[in-house]
């Protein structure tokens, strides 16, 4: 039996880890196409690029192959079904929200409904909720709601991606023929279909789901916690407006170019060091954040 070389094995192992970082390079010449519905001739252009380019890496060629496969895929192929949707009632009070954070909010974004799940009014971001729970002044859940978009299950995935970009939102509610809620799809779901598994936002909640301030210089955090949340805690800006990542995981992957091994330490600024404390070959799970200067205000999720 033929055995692959170590170099070939390492290439395969790192393939999925690095692919997301080729997207910006691949799409920069054609990103204007995503401002509207994706035209059919877009795919012929991509096919020619895939066939004729001699300068593309294996990762880039595979992403283009996945892009071509997405041509016929619809929202229905990847959506989270209604039965698996976690949502909160619009009338939920602050005490109930405190409990929901512990047991009912597994993701950074959670849907809000009025009356029944067929009447989704929007979604809240966990960072907005944390701020509101800290202040507790004139708390109204309605003030925290962000807009979502509506889509049919038959909508093509690339058309959905274009619409999400245009509307500047990451969540779409899928409706059935009667106007009821049929499912949910996030931009992460679409990107996973394009580049392979990024990190499953729909996994069971783990012990690392939020973050914990250990002391004035140390934070233990789930790698999926958003960078904006970390910025608020430490009082330091880590993300530029044009950066295309949202989470601590995205920050680390952008710095490293791959998924670093457990124990790897990354200096993301003069004041901040991030150490990988839990990871698998495909994604980061947990990190330890160490600050040379103390936190401006210590708080825990």
From Swiss-Prot:
The miscellaneous annotation reads: It is not know if this bacteria is hemolytic.
**Keywords in alphabetical order:** CBS domain, Repeat
According to UniProt, the name of this protein is Possible hemolysin C
What would you give as a GO molecular function for this chain, any one? flavin adenine dinucleotide binding
GO CC terms on record? plasma membrane
Q: Is Repeat a UniProt keyword of this protein?
A: yes
Repeat keyword on record: yes
Q: Which organism is it from?
A: Rickettsia bellii (strain RML369-C)
Q: Which family does it belong to?
A: Belongs to the UPF0053 family. Hemolysin C subfamily.
Could you name the domain of life of the organism this protein comes from?
A: Bacteria
Q: Where is the CBS domain?
A: 79-141, 144-201
């Amino acid at each position: 039996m033929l055995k692959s070389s170590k170099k070939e094995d390492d290439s395969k192992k790192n393939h999925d880890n690095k692919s997301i970082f080729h997207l910006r390079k691949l799409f920069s010449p054609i990103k204007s196409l995503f401002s509207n519905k994706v035209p059919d001739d877009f795919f012929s252009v991509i096919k020619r690029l895939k066939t004729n380019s001699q300068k593309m890496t294996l990762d880039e060629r595979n992403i283009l192959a996945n892009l071509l496969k997405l041509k016929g895929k619809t929202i229905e192929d990847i959506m989270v079904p209604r039965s698996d949707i976690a949502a909160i009632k619009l009338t939920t009070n602050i005490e109930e929200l405190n409990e929901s954070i512990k047991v009912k909010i597994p993701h950074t974004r959670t849907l809000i409904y009025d009356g029944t799940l067929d009447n989704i009014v929007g979604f809240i971001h966990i960072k907005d909720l944390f701020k509101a729970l800290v202040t507790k002044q004139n708390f109204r859940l309605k003030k925290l709601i962000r807009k979502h978009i509506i889509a049919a299950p038959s909508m093509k995935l690339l058309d959905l991606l274009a619409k999400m970009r245009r509307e500047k939102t990451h969540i779409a509610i899928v409706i059935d023929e009667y106007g009821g809620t049929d499912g949910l799809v996030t931009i992460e779901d679409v990107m996973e279909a394009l580049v392979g598994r990024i990190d499953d936002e729909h996994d069971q909640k783990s012990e690392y789901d939020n973050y914990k301030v250990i002391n004035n210089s140390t934070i233990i955090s789930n790698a999926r916690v958003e960078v904006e949340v970390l910025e608020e805690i430490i009082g330091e800006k880590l993300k530029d407006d044009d950066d295309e990542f949202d989470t601590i995981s995205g920050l680390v992957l952008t710095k490293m170019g791959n998924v670093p091994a457990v124990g790897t330490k990354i200096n993301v600024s003069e004041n901040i060091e991030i150490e990988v404390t839990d990871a698998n070959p495909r994604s980061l799970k947990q990190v330890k954040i160490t600050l040379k200067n103390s936190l401006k205000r210590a708080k825990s999720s």
